[in-house]
Amino acid sequence: MPSQSPYHALSRYFSFPNRDHQAWWTGKGPLLGNMLADAGYPEQQQYQYLTLFNLHLIPALGPSESHGAGIDGAEWKSLLSGSGKLEFSMTYRKSAVSLRIAFEPTSLLAGTKKDVFNKRRTQQLLGDLERLDIDIDTVLYHPLFDTLVVSDEEEAALQNAGTVIPDSSRTQQLLALNLIEGNVRADLYVYPYVKALATGTASSTLLWAAVKKIDRYNRFRDALSILKGYFETYPSSTTNPMFLSSDLAAPRNAFCRLFFSETNFSWERVQHLWTLGGTLSDKPTLKGLELAKILWDILGISTAPASPDSFPLLFTFELRPEQPYLRQKLGIPVSGLTESAIANACVAFFERLGWDDHAASYRTNLSAY
């Protein structure tokens, strides 16, 4: 008898409490199983992570994409990169590939009068995950929630004022679970847009305050001073503070990242923002900029300004307790490119880096999804 994949083996013994649960499992489980196998996870870990997905994550995904609306016909639209409420992605390093599950915890109540801005489900899920044998510490969750998520009173004030908030801007919290060597590292993403509307406080002010709130040991003081100083010195109408992320770890070990969108697609602007106007000139910064330029050229990025309905560039600044105090990343939108063009660009980039194994397997793996 031919051996079954972990997904098919588990499917024989899982029961489903409702049709949404079954739809999520049959719709997304095979993809997760294939990606785990292609990334080289040992079979035992494939069973582990598929079980985690079925038993603990699917109940926090809310109505399935095929069934749509929740209670009272409410249909929650997540902010998650235009891909719906759930996203699987791979992180490539020279000698390894790891998987990431990003999603907005959601319930049937999301978008109804009982949970207008889908605030409740994330905290409930984190409580469930804390009871598992994985490395999650939620001590930083509460100060981030209090600083960046609307309170019940602020929520009521927005409703009473008749404030119109687009569906795509209602998301306030996302989770990403990084699947690493049989363990899970959880990252929390918090968006202050709704809080800024409710309080009349600029998103940047809320984000700076949130960093200070979770920085109990002044680990990010120097990094924050450099970053804040740049944006005060070089204000730009094309750059906007977007959100903050922190891993859910002990405060002495947790990282903090700040994200900024950029609608100016000129390479000169990328250089200026990446180096913070020349303030950052250390070797890791310049090497990262060099690699970003290689990918930029391979993709053939247009220098035209982003249109209102297109995705901007996304800059990430990770705050660090030692030099170099900031570590940058650049997210380049690929909307408008075909999957074939994107795959060819990734393969070409891997080849430039000398990552021959990744270059050889990337197209084949992608075509299977």
Swiss-Prot record:
NCBIfam families noted in UniProt: arom_pren_DMATS
Domain of life: Eukaryota
Record organism: Malbranchea aurantiaca
Keyword match Transferase: yes
GO biological process, one term: alkaloid metabolic process
InterPro entries reported in the protein's UniProt record: Aro_prenylTrfase_DMATS
GO-annotated molecular function: prenyltransferase activity
Catalytic class of the enzyme: transferase
Protein name: Prenyltransferase malB
